């Protein structure tokens, strides 16, 4: 049983906790959040506007958060170095505040007794792992790793299957992305990224994303061959990747469909999905897979130039991969 601590009880922290309660290989033993007191944690975990009520029991008891009868130690430290993970029995920490995303900053958790840290965001310098793509390259000399971003987790399996079968010359990605907490409800100041400060519910907002370039880090052969951008759109959850790429080896679109379907039923089962249905974004709310290839939405200009479409629940799919990565890391101890 992998004993886990969660730092930051926001969208991802709460959903990693939900995902952990569907997995019998992990156990959440501690949660740290200086901004949310225990009773508020109970409320925030129980009710969720996007994913619905938690199907189970949640209560506060003797200063602990008790989920499905399991007591979880609560810390309220601002400085990660002060969190006594070791005392709570947490060996692995999910760093999901969005603040401590470098190796140096995330390493602070090790001072409190944690053995390893998974950053639930892209990192400037921590090694990035995408389940189903490069997780086999993990070795236990690494103390701090990143689970990359939700978009990289959607794009990388798609890019891997295409590159392994046909060779990718180059590609451009667009993610049509649901609203996230960093956006504004109405127009407001936003540092250097002026567009990002515009009202999230009122606009389609062009934005930058490092997700495509990050694929080059997890699939080295694609380094420098992919870049991309995002459009933030007024939906609460579920995003979609549009990958337009040139293939080295010509392929009929029907053959690409067959290859994607085979991958989704084989080595990438549970990570890559496949559908030929006439789906829309809300059909994937609560989907635990990283990337669901939409066979009916893609198009080919010719045998070497194609547009591929893949859906993802940017909250829940990603949170499940964080749990999967923790389980994989523990298997290498």
From Swiss-Prot:
Subunit structure: Homotetramer.
Keyword Nucleus: yes
Residue positions binding NAD(+): 11-12, 33, 78, 120, 314
Residue list for modification S-nitrosocysteine: 150
Entries under CDD domains matching the protein: GAPDH_I_C, GAPDH_I_N
Gene3D superfamilies, alphabetized: Dihydrodipicolinate Reductase, domain 2 (3.30.360.10), NAD(P)-binding Rossmann-like Domain (3.40.50.720)
Name of this chain's protein: Glyceraldehyde-3-phosphate dehydrogenase
Disulfide bond entries: none
Family in the record: Belongs to the glyceraldehyde-3-phosphate dehydrogenase family.
GO molecular function, one term: NADP binding
EC number: 1.2.1.12, 2.6.99.-
Site (Activates thiol group during catalysis) location in chain: 177
One GO cellular component term: microtubule cytoskeleton
Pathway: Carbohydrate degradation; glycolysis; pyruvate from D-glyceraldehyde 3-phosphate: step 1/5
Active-site residue list: 150 (nucleophile)
Chain sites annotated for binding D-glyceraldehyde 3-phosphate: 149-151, 180, 209-210, 232
Pfam families in the cross-refs: Gp_dh_C, Gp_dh_N
Organism in which the protein naturally occurs: Pelodiscus sinensis
Gene Ontology annotations of biological process type: glucose metabolic process; glycolytic process; microtubule cytoskeleton organization; neuron apoptotic process; peptidyl-cysteine S-trans-nitrosylation; positive regulation of canonical NF-kappaB signal transduction; positive regulation of type I interferon production; protein stabilization
Role according to the record: Has both glyceraldehyde-3-phosphate dehydrogenase and nitrosylase activities, thereby playing a role in glycolysis and nuclear functions, respectively. Glyceraldehyde-3-phosphate dehydrogenase is a key enzyme in glycolysis that catalyzes the first step of the pathway by converting D-glyceraldehyde 3-phosphate (G3P) into 3-phospho-D-glyceroyl phosphate. Participates in nuclear events including transcription, RNA transport, DNA replication and apoptosis.
Catalytic activity: D-glyceraldehyde 3-phosphate + phosphate + NAD(+) = (2R)-3-phospho-glyceroyl phosphate + NADH + H(+); S-nitroso-L-cysteinyl-[GAPDH] + L-cysteinyl-[protein] = L-cysteinyl-[GAPDH] + S-nitroso-L-cysteinyl-[protein]
